[in-house]
Amino acid sequence: VFTYRDYMSRVRGGHNFTQIRFSDKEVYSYRAKVDLILALNRETYMLHRDRLKEDGVVISHEEISEERLIRLPLDQIKKKVKNPKVLNTVGLGAIAKYFGIPFSISVEVLKETFNERSYSDNIAAFMEGYNLLDSKHKLQIKEDRNIIINGNKALALGAIAAGCRFYCGYPMTPSTSILSYFSSRSNEMGIMVDQVEDEV
């Protein structure tokens, strides 16, 4: 699995996106062309439509003039799923179904990701998206002893292995997850973690 996150250098707003490439073989970079675009707004579609493969699809709730569009009826789903904050998870459900990811595996991932309070809303939203379309691909499930780890977590683990016992930082992208990981392991690893008042 190779992920690439792109975000603008501003406190809030701007166009942000994540590109995910996965394979049963090792991958070392992303590719220019993509199989699927989940467009949460029209701007995303306009900026990335030229990167879509000929047999690719766009999943969006926006009114887009695109033959390959799979439309998410979020206005209807909103009436069933009372929490508007989880509507993005509808798109996640549609992606999982499109790639043929088993529902049971998806449920386990959602349980690991969300706390008990938000899990029920997110699983309801996920099911709405999952039931919207048919699978185009059928991924083979393989056991893999390798772990999935991001760069910041690898950096934090490396620092701990090298003997780091103090970490001081401010929760600001792109280093927020380093601070979060150190904080979550501080008691277990005997590390002093300090979050400073501001980024200066």
What are these language model-derived features?
Residues V1-C168:
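Active-site cofactor/cluster-binding pocket
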Residues E143-V200:
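Non-catalytic terminal/interface segments that mediate subunit docking, oligomerization
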